[in-house]
């Protein structure tokens, strides 16, 4: 059994040759400043996130991309390069805690992820910035905008809203399937990936979803493991699917990109009222009938 250590086009007006800076950190760290991954005692201790920064014009607000659950900064490789070339802005892609090359921690709260991002943005001098978050990353972006509106020049939330998405999520099944995968040691990577795909297919019929999850399969000294922190993500899944209730509001320019066939935001439902569902954001809300796939 394994251990686990259509593109959306953003309008040019919303955002504005580059070189690259990268940072990778050890894959296992812990934070003791939480109580069970949901409710946080005091300010959570920020972790040093892994990131990739494409250089650009320093006088323009940088574009920062935040991935969703089981994702990583590599999800945005193509769009990040395109945005850097098209807008001449700095573009930052980041691995969230418990994902990609960033450290692992038992604290999966959005407060903790917001603190991580605030620390990184200050470290890199990217305040204020245009914050673009998909799914889990969208909730992190929304929370940061509420906590520190001066940090977020503009906000883009992709296929997500500040609502509980647990009832429509299949992620629990995905995590159970990933945990059950069993790959022998010292097999070729291509064969290991094929074995994992075959085992996942009994639960996850969509090959696109399987290929996305398999981006997390890594080899360390002949042993294959999942780089996402499955134990912690599974334990605190409900907290990840929910959104912290906050009294603040964010008055900056905000764009919600909602997929027409999204399972996470049922905007086509007659009961969906943007002003009631999104009370903390400006009344101008753009709902696009697109597939929000990254």
Where are the regions a protein language model picked out?
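Alpha/beta-hydrolase fold catalytic core
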Residues: 1-64, 81-90, 126-127, 284, ...
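Active-site glycine-rich loops that stabilize anionic/oxyanionic intermediates
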Residues: 60, 68-71, 135, 260
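Alpha/beta-hydrolase active-site loop signature
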Residues: 70, 96-100, 162, 286
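Flexible "cap/lid" loop of the alpha/beta hydrolase fold
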Residues: 142-192, 196
């Amino acid at each position: 059994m394994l251990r686990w250590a259509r593109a959306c086009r953003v309008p040019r007006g919303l955002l504005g040759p580059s070189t690259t800076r990268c940072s990778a950190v050890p894959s296992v760290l812990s934070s003791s400043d939480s109580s069970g991954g949901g409710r946080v005692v005091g300010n959570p201790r920020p972790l040093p996130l892994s990131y990739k920064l494409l250089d650009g014009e320093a006088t323009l607000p940088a574009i920062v991309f935040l991935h969703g659950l089981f994702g990583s900064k590599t999800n945005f490789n193509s769009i990040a390069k395109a945005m850097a070339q098209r807008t001449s802005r700095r573009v930052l892609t980041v691995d969230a805690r418990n994902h990609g090359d960033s450290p692992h921690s038992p604290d999966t709260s959005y407060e903790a992820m917001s603190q991580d991002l605030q620390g990184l943005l200050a470290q890199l001098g990217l305040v204020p910035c245009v914050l673009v978050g998909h799914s889990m990353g969208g909730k992190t972006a929304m929370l940061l905008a509420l906590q520190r509106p001066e940090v977020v020049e503009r906000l883009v939330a992709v296929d997500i809203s500040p609502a509980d998405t647990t009832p429509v999520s299949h992620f629990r099944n995905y995590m159970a399937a990933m945990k059950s995968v069993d790959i022998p040691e010292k097999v070729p990577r291509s064969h290991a990936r094929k074995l994992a795909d075959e085992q996942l297919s009994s639960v996850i019929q969509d090959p696109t979803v399987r290929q996305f999850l398999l981006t997390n399969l890594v080899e360390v000294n002949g042993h294959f493991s999942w780089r996402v922190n499955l134990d912690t993500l599974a334990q605190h899944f409900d907290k990840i699917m929910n959104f912290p209730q906050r009294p603040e509001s964010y008055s900056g320019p905000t764009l919600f990109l909602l997929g027409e066939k999204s399972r996470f935001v049922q905007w086509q439902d007659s009961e969906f009222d943007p002003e009631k569902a999104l009370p903390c954001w400006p009344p101008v809300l753009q709902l696009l009938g697109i597939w929000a796939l990254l």
